[in-house]
Amino acid sequence: MKENSNPENPESQEKNLSETPIPKITIICSAPDLASQNIKTQLLNLIEWKLLEIPENSEFSAARESQDGKFRLVDIEETHVFQDGLDRKLENAGLPASLIIFASKHRSKEEISSLTVHCTGNPSDDVRLGGCPKSLAVSSPAAMKSILVEMKRLAEQKGLKYDVTLEVTHHGPTELSVPSLYAEIGSTEVQWKDPEAGEVAAKAILAVSLVKVPVAVGFGGGHYAMRQTKLLFETGISFGHNFPKYKLEFVDEALIRQAIEKSKADFAYFDRKSMKSEERKKISKILENLGLSVLKESEIREKYGN
């Protein structure tokens, strides 16, 4: 945009303001990711999009905006997990984001058909899958809840035999200043290319809601956070960051403080039976020092039950 040569000219100022790109919910699709391309195809079929001009020197291969102005759809040539700083790159390309949704594949050894949602971060020093050590991305609990609930509703409506579940915090990117989440199809090439699953994921993304809900940070359980998932579906709450039992040894005050701040958490939840007594005591003490209460499942259901 050219600078306003006459700052006293209201008409010129109004023109500049109107040309300032507005942050949008931004869906990121990766070229080498089969599930991402499946979801992209469904998104393009479901609603009308217009192609956007992007700078030649940007790292994006294409960008579109929905006709209603709510979403942008941006193509990248790389994998999602190594996209630290993506928010700044989007802004520099004139595509600022208010929320980043990574449309992605999910891979598991069990090869379970699944639709999953999670936020990103590295509780330990392991950064093989992107991000920085002991760093968490800003989560979007309301968006995660709405997408997961809609995935479940649509999958049941279609009779799809897919597990719909919340995953714990894992992998990159971590260095993003705007909220983000992953919406995924798993867990093999068969599911990644399944158009029915792609349609469910795409429709759920387009139905995303940012209406505030009570938020917990979670501790314990396995990778698929089964008890947290049940609470998300069966009560009015959502979860921000979740740390599974096999990562609790790395959880310290600095990480918990990050999780609270980057989830805007109202309380904490323990999957108690999965946690060692010393882990519960350690984390309880940290939470007490930080002023965050721990609610039991029965208390959550009583206070926030649907």
Swiss-Prot record:
Catalytic activity, reaction form: a D-aminoacyl-tRNA + H2O = a tRNA + a D-alpha-amino acid + H(+); glycyl-tRNA(Ala) + H2O = tRNA(Ala) + glycine + H(+)
A Pfam family that the UniProt record links to this protein: tRNA_deacylase
GO molecular-function terms, A-Z: D-aminoacyl-tRNA deacylase activity; zinc ion binding
A biological process from GO: D-amino acid catabolic process
InterPro entries: Deacylase_DtdA_archaea, DtdA
E.C. no: 3.1.1.96
Keyword Metal-binding: yes
Co-factor binding details: Binds 2 Zn(2+) ions per subunit.
Obligatory cofactor(s): Zn(2+)
Keywords: Hydrolase, Metal-binding, Zinc
Gene3D superfamilies named among the record's database cross-references: AF0625-like
Subunit structure: Monomer.
Entry's family note: Belongs to the DtdA deacylase family.
HAMAP family assigned: Deacylase_DtdA (MF_00562)
Classification via PANTHER family: D-AMINOACYL-TRNA DEACYLASE
Role description: D-aminoacyl-tRNA deacylase with broad substrate specificity. By recycling D-aminoacyl-tRNA to D-amino acids and free tRNA molecules, this enzyme counteracts the toxicity associated with the formation of D-aminoacyl-tRNA entities in vivo.
Name of protein: D-aminoacyl-tRNA deacylase
Source organism: Methanosarcina barkeri (strain Fusaro / DSM 804)
Lineage of producing organism: Archaea, Methanobacteriati, Methanobacteriota, Stenosarchaea group, Methanomicrobia
